[in-house]
From Swiss-Prot:
Enzyme class at the top of the EC tree: transferase
Name of this chain's protein: Tritrans,polycis-undecaprenyl-diphosphate synthase (geranylgeranyl-diphosphate specific)
Keywords for the protein's UniProt record, in alphabetical order: Magnesium, Metal-binding, Transferase
Residues engaged in binding Mg(2+): 43, 232
GO terms of molecular function: ditrans,polycis-polyprenyl diphosphate synthase [(2E,6E)-farnesyl diphosphate specific] activity; magnesium ion binding
Primary role: Catalyzes the sequential condensation of isopentenyl diphosphate (IPP) with geranylgeranyl diphosphate (GGPP) to yield (2Z,6Z,10Z,14Z,18Z,22Z,26Z,30E,34E,38E)-undecaprenyl diphosphate (tritrans,heptacis-UPP). It is probably the precursor of glycosyl carrier lipids.
Signal recorded as keyword: no
Catalytic center residues: 43, 91 (proton acceptor)
Catalytic activity: geranylgeranyl diphosphate + 7 isopentenyl diphosphate = tri-trans,hepta-cis-undecaprenyl diphosphate + 7 diphosphate
């Protein structure tokens, strides 16, 4: 189901009222059913930077800081799985300078995750999902190190879609299934939805309850095509670096009011 939220940054004069409203929402949300899995299309970094007459990577940096905040929000609410769309296979078509800057940022952030106190204190497992072979060697190695160091954790999960495409994920799953059938490890008649799920980039992960897209665009952009068949979709008219906790809480609160039918 699609739900659109229009969000505006409040004037500093209204901050006390917003803080009060945020605390009210937090209490309401904590009293309701908490989603297990939230997925976010982190859109609007470049437009946010352009509005400030800054280069794209300025927006990407502040987008990465916003993601750190969202991880904290999820921990506070007990949302165990967070999946974020960081870089699509189509994003490689951007300018070389922007892609190179992004790759440098990804490498830095993966290396920070390895030593981040919160990752180890909260027990966050990091999964990098996508065609990793398309990534530069240094980024791939940093991503794999973050996965290796956090592999033993299972309190929370941070799935980072990098060099990712929903169609590519399905194609890669089909190839692996066909290979296992040909090798005799899988029978054709045994293939069902749950079997397919085991061949996705992050096997057996519960489907997202909620998909949020920031930036004002109303589309899913090839994100988690297999997994979001029954997810609740929320589109927010605010660039990702400006996404507020109050916006997040309003989405969760709206989700809690829904009767999910799962196609019935």
């Amino acid at each position: 189901m699609i739900y659109r939220i229009i969000s505006h940054i409040p004037s500093i004069f209204f901050k006390p009222a917003y803080d009060l409203y945020e605390r009210y929402l937090l209490e309401k949300v904590k009293a309701g059913v908490i989603p297990k899995h939230v997925a976010i299309i982190m859109d609007g970094n470049r437009r946010w930077a352009r509005k400030r007459e800054k280069p794209p990577w300025y927006g990407h940096f502040f987008g990465s800081k916003k993601l750190e905040e969202i991880v904290e929000w999820c921990h506070e609410l007990g949302i165990r799985i967070l999946t974020v769309y960081a870089f699509s296979t189509e994003n490689f078509k951007r300018s070389k300078e922007e892609v190179d800057r992004l790759m440098k940022l990804f490498e830095e952030k993966f290396r920070e995750l390895v030593t981040d106190r919160r990752v180890h204190e909260y027990g966050i497992r990091v999964n990098v999902m996508g065609r990793k072979e398309l990534l530069p060697k240094n980024v791939r190695e940093a991503a794999e190190e973050a996965e290796r160091v956090t592999r033993k954790y299972n309190n929370y999960f941070l799935n980072i879609a990098l060099a990712y495409g929903g169609r590519s994920e399905i194609v890669d799953a089909i190839k692996d299934i066909v290979n296992d059938v040909l090798e005799g490890r899988l029978k054709l008649e045994d293939i069902n939805e749950e079997i397919v799920r085991k061949y996705l980039y992050v096997p057996n992960m519960p489907d997202p309850d909620i998909v949020i897209r920031t930036g004002g665009e109303v589309r899913i952009s090839n994100f988690l095509l297999y997994q979001i068949a029954y997810s609740e979709l929320f589109f927010v008219d605010v660039y990702f670096p400006e996404f507020r906790k109050i916006d997040f809480l309003r989405i969760i609160r709206e989700f809690q009011k829904r009767e999910r039918r799962f196609g019935r």
